[in-house]
Amino acid sequence: MLLGALRMEERKGLMGRERDQFPVGMRVLAVDDDPVCLKVLETLLRRCQYHVTSTNQAITALKLLRENRDMFDLVISDVHMPDMDGFKLLELVGLEMDLPVIMLSVNGETKTVMKGITHGACDYLLKPVRIEELRNIWQHVVRRKFGNRERNNLDFSKECNKPQSADTDHGPYQPTCGSSDQNGRSSRKRKELHGEDDDEGDDNDYQENDEPSAAKKPRVVWSVELHRKFVAAVNQLGIDKAVPKRILELMNVEKLTRENVASHLQKYRLYLKRLGAVASQQASIVAAFGGRDPSFLHIGAFEGLQSYQPFAPSAALPSFNPHGLLTRTSAAAAFGLQELAAPSSTIQTSTGNVTVGHCLEENQQANLAQGLTAAIGQPQLQQNWIHQEGNGLSDVFSGSSLTNTLSSTLQRVPSSSLPPQELLECKQAKVSMPPSIRIPPSSSALLERTLGVSTNLGDSSISQQGALPIDGGFSADRLPLHSSFDGAVATKLDTSLAASQREIGQQGKFSVSMLVSPSDNLALAKNAKTGASSSGSTIILPLDTARHSDYLQFGGASNSLQKMDGQKQDHIQSSNIIWSSMPSTQLPSDTQIHNTQSQRLDSGSFNHNIGAHLADQTNASASILPQMKFDTRISEEKMKQKNTYDLGSSKLQGGFNSSGCNFDGLLNSIIKVEKDDLPFMDNELGCDLFPLGACI
C-alpha cells in the first residue's frame, strides 16, 4: 500500500513539473518547400525551446503524422507547395489527427486568410515570420486540449447517465470511458460524419431549389367520370364504412393519392350533411300540412298535364300558409252557413268543410299550391282573378265560389287502378260542362243564354275552370255521398264541387239551398268515354249583368234549357260528378246528411239536387269531371255591384277553420283572364271563358 502511494505521488510531481515548464519541449512539425524559409523557421522555433521536426514536402509530412499520431502537438505549414496545396494538407490533418495547424504565407490578402481560417487553421502568419509570434503559438495547443477535454467530459456524462444494456460486457455501474485521444478521435469522426451529412443535405437542398416544380404535388381535378367512380365506391362500401384507402383501391385510378381521396371524401360528407338538413326541413313542412308520407315530393310530372310542374324538393313555400288549409277539428258533418244581406254589395261567404277533407288531403294541397305556382312562373298571385274594371260579375258568381270549386278539385294522384284499355278510352274522351243562364220571368227584359265549358282530354290541358282531364275516372267501387242542405243561411263552398243556388226572400235576405243526393246514372260515364257527354242548367242573372256580355259570350248548348213554369213550380235538377283519387278508407260507404227544408218565395218552393259519385281509386291523372245543372231564382231586387269583395278567412260553425288560405290566389296562378280574346268551339260547347293559352 505504501509503495503504491509513493508511485502516485511521483507521477503527480512529474506532471506538475511538466506543467510548470510548459511550453518548453512542445513538439512542432514545420513544412515548407523553400529551404531558406524552412531553415529560418526551424532556428526560431528552437530559440523558443520547442522540439522541431522539419520537411520540405507536404506528402512526407502527412506520412509522418499518420505513422506517429502522438509525436506532434502542433503543425506549421506553408500555403503554396508544389506537391500538395497547404489547404489540402490542412483539411487532411484536421480530419485525421485533430491537431492545431498554423498557416504560413507571403500572401496576406483577406480572401486568402479567410480561406485558411474557414478550412480549420488556428492561425495565419505572414512571411517573414518573427520570433514574437512564435513564442505565443503554444496557446493554440492549450486551447485545443481544453476544448477536447470539455467535449470528452460532456460525452462521458452522457454515457454515464445512459442506462447499461444487458448485452454489454461491463458491469451495470461501470461506464465505458476511453482515453482522451480516443475520445478526441471519436469526436472527430462524428464531426466528419456530420459534416458529410451536412454537405449532402446542402446538395439536396440546392437540387430542390433548382427544381421547385418537382417538389409540388400535382393537383387532382375531379371530373364527372372520376366523381362517379368515387360515388360508386362509396356506395359499395357504405358511407359509414368508407375509408380513403379502400375507396382508392376500388377506384383504381392512376396518379390518385390517398390524400386526394380523403379530402374529396370529407367534402362529400359535408355535401350529404347539407342534403340531410334540407330533407329534414321538407319533412317538417310535410308534417305541418298533416301528411304522413313525403314520397309525393319526388314524384315526376303530373300525369295528363304536361305543363304542370311538381313540387321541387329544394323549393320553399314563400306564399303558402300551411295553417290556411281546412283541418277537421270535430266530427260535425253539418256546414256552417251565414246569412247575407242582399242590399249590401259585398257578399260575406263561409267555407265548406267536408269537400276538402274528402277530396284532397292537406299535404296534396300544399304540393298542388306550390307546383301550380312554379308551373305558371308568376312571382306573385293576383288576388282577384275576375276583379277587373266594372267588377259586377263578381257579385253574380258570389265572390270566388267558382274559382274555389276548381281549386279544390285539383289533385295529385299516384297511380291508376283501371285497365289500360279503360285509361285509353278515358284519355280520348271529351267532357263538357255547359251550365245555362236565364233571367227570371218576373223581369221585363230577360236574357236567356247558355254558358258552355269544355275540356279536351286529348290535349292534356285545362281549357276552362271546373273541367279537368280524366284518366281512369270511373270505377266499379263508387262511394255514394247523400247530403242535403237547407237554404236558411248563405254559404260559399270554397273547395266544394257543388254549385250554389240563390234566392232572395221577401225580407231581402240572400240565401242558398243545396241538396246532395246519390245518383246511379251511368250515362255520364258512358258519354264521357264517347266524348259526347254534356249537360245544361239555368242560372238567373239580374238585368245589369247584360253589360258583362263581353265576359260571358254565350252560345247554343247541346242540351235544351229548362224553363221554369212559375215561381210556385218546384224544379229539381240532378248533376253527375265524377270524383276520383280518394281512398275508400277515408270515407264511409254511405254518408247521409239530411237537413231538407223547402224555402218558399211567393208560395213557391225551390230545391236543388246534386249527385256525386266518389270513385275509390289510387291513381288517375286527373280527378274531376263536374257536370252540373243550376236553377237559380232571383227576385227583381238586383244585387248591387261593387268593385271589391271580402275574401277573408272565415270560421265555420261545424268546427272547421280556414285561416288565411285563399284558393282564389291559387286559381289565379293557373288562369289569366283575357277580356278581348274569348275563343269559341264549334257545336260541342257554348263558349270558353278563357283562352287555352292562359291555362298552360
UniProtKB/Swiss-Prot annotation:
Q: Name one GO molecular function term.
A: sequence-specific DNA binding
Mark the residues carrying the PTM 4-aspartylphosphate. 78
DNA-binding region, residue intervals: 214-273
Q: Which stretches of sequence are listed as region Disordered?
A: 154-214
Q: Where is the composition biased (Acidic residues)?
A: 195-211
Please list the residue ranges that the record marks as compositionally biased, kind Polar residues. 176-185
Residue runs in coiled coils: none
Q: Which Pfam families match?
A: Myb_DNA-binding, Response_reg
InterPro entries cross-referenced by the UniProt entry: ARR-like, CheY-like_superfamily, Homeodomain-like_sf, Myb_dom, Myb_dom_plants, Response_reg_B-typ_pln, SANT/Myb, Sig_transdc_resp-reg_receiver
Q: Which GO terms describe its biological process?
A: cytokinin-activated signaling pathway; phosphorelay signal transduction system; positive regulation of DNA-templated transcription
Q: Where is the Response regulatory domain?
A: 27-142
GO cellular component assignments: nucleus
Identify the SUPFAM superfamilies for this entry. CheY-like, Homeodomain-like
Q: Where in the cell is it found?
A: Nucleus
* Record's keyword terms, sorted: Activator, Cytokinin signaling pathway, DNA-binding, Nucleus, Phosphoprotein, Transcription, Transcription regulation, Two-component regulatory system
So what family is this one in? Answer: Belongs to the ARR family. Type-B subfamily.
Function field: Transcriptional activator that binds specific DNA sequence. Functions as a response regulator involved in His-to-Asp phosphorelay signal transduction system. Phosphorylation of the Asp residue in the receiver domain activates the ability of the protein to promote the transcription of target genes. May directly activate some type-A response regulators in response to cytokinins.
Protein name according to UniProt = Two-component response regulator ORR22
Annotated gene: RR22
